[in-house]
């Protein structure tokens, strides 16, 4: 049996621009693609932290070192420049490999530079900050 597990995540990237009249896709700085183990044309999920929108599109390469995160085509209606997004990809992992599977987690700063790289999530807080 195979399970669908998180493969890659770019966390809190800033949308740099949106191009409505462009073929649908998400342009991502090639340095970020390498860090997150993503490739051109790979299916990705984009979750907009600012407005709660969630959608699926695919990757196109943006120039290396540019910091570009662009939403194109109909995806451009789902975000605005300056919005924070999470970009995720999933993989089919054989049941036997599940215990050793480690996703690539890329945490961004406000300028779309890599702040931290991890291969496993941190434990969630044990108490709610709202209490």
Curated annotation (Swiss-Prot):
Task: Fill in the PTM field for this protein.
Answer: Is synthesized initially as an inactive proenzyme, which is activated by self-cleavage at a specific serine bond to produce a beta-subunit with a hydroxyl group at its C-terminus and an alpha-subunit with a pyruvoyl group at its N-terminus.
* UniProt xrefs under InterPro entries: Asp_de-COase-like_dom_sf, Asp_decarbox
- GO term, biological process aspect, one: pantothenate biosynthetic process
Origin superkingdom: Bacteria
Pyruvic acid (Ser) is found on 25
| Key words, A-Z | Autocatalytic cleavage, Cytoplasm, Decarboxylase, Lyase, Pantothenate biosynthesis, Pyruvate, Schiff base, Zymogen
Gene3D superfamilies documented for this protein: 2.40.40.20
Places the protein is found: Cytoplasm
- Write down the EC number: 4.1.1.11
Residue numbers annotated as active site: 25, 58
Its required cofactor(s), as named, are:
pyruvate
SUPFAM superfamilies the UniProt entry points to:
ADC-like (SSF50692)
Question: Mind telling me which GO cellular component terms the entry cites?
Answer: cytosol
**Chief location of this protein?**
cytoplasm
The residues the record assigns to binding substrate are 57, 73-75
- Reaction catalyzed: L-aspartate + H(+) = beta-alanine + CO2
Q: What is this protein called?
A: Aspartate 1-decarboxylase
């Amino acid at each position: 049996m195979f399970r669908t597990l998180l493969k890659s995540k770019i966390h809190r990237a800033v949308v740099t621009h949106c191009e409505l009249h462009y073929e649908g896709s998400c342009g991502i700085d090639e340095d970020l693609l390498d860090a997150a183990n993503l490739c051109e044309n790979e299916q990705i999920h984009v979750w907009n932290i600012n407005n709660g929108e969630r959608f699926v599109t695919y990757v196109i390469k943006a120039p290396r070192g540019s910091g570009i995160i662009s939403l194109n085509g109909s995806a451009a209606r789902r975000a605005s420049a300056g919005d924070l997004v999470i970009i995720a990809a999933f993989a089919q992992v054989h049941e036997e490999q599940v215990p050793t599977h480690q996703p690539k987690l890329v945490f961004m700063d406000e300028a779309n530079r890599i702040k931290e790289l991890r291969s496993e999530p941190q434990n969630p807080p044990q108490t709610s900050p709202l209490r």
